[in-house]
Amino acid sequence: CLALITVSYDEKPGIQAISNTAPDLRPTSEHGEVYRDAEYKRLGTLSLLAGIDLLTGEAIPLVSETHKSSDFIEFLKILDKKYPSQDTIRIILDNHSAHTSKETRRFLDTMPKGRFKFVFTPKHGSWLNMIESFFSKMTRQMLRGIRVNTKQELEERIYKYFDEVNREPVV
């Protein structure tokens, strides 16, 4: 092991893609606010799997239709490609079943010994994981009240948010 990379990781499932049924009314001289009809159309949900490199502050996203072991494995593959092969990647995460499933263990068995090290947060201790505050900020800044025309548009906007955040990472 040349370096020890530490990544704070979690999932944010059930991000709703919601579209308007009528166009928003723009502000005018009489009213300075955007008016939005209370009616909306649900287009489905997406799941976000994400990590923050605790040394560099870089946020690493994976948007998925599902929230399963295969998605978690896909995220591990992203980390594996991102960091030099001789480094150990320590991941701080919760006790979600996908993190210890047979499928995940089979994948980890194919990796060099010591490539991934999992550090589990205590039960009811998710607030100890830095990614949770990132998700909270993302919800306030970007997801709350968002309207899109398709799930694809929501996915694109999530990835764009990560690109913007990573221009000036906070560590």
State what each model feature region is:
Residues 34-40, 110-130, 146-148:
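RNase H-like polynucleotidyl transferase catalytic core
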Residues 46, 94-95, 118-140, 152-154:
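RNase H-like two-metal-ion nuclease catalytic core shared by retroviral integrases
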Residues 1-70, 74-77:
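Extended, low-complexity cationic-aromatic segments
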Residues 3-4, 56, 87-88, 113-117:
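Short glycine-/polar-rich loops that comprise or flank the Walker A/P-loop
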Residues 102-111:
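Short, aromatic/basic amphipathic alpha-helical patches
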Residues 70-90:
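Short, basic/hydrophobic alpha-helical segments
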Residues 132-171:
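C-terminal anion-handling pockets and recognition modules
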Residues 87-99:
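Acidic/histidine-rich, metal-coordinating catalytic segments
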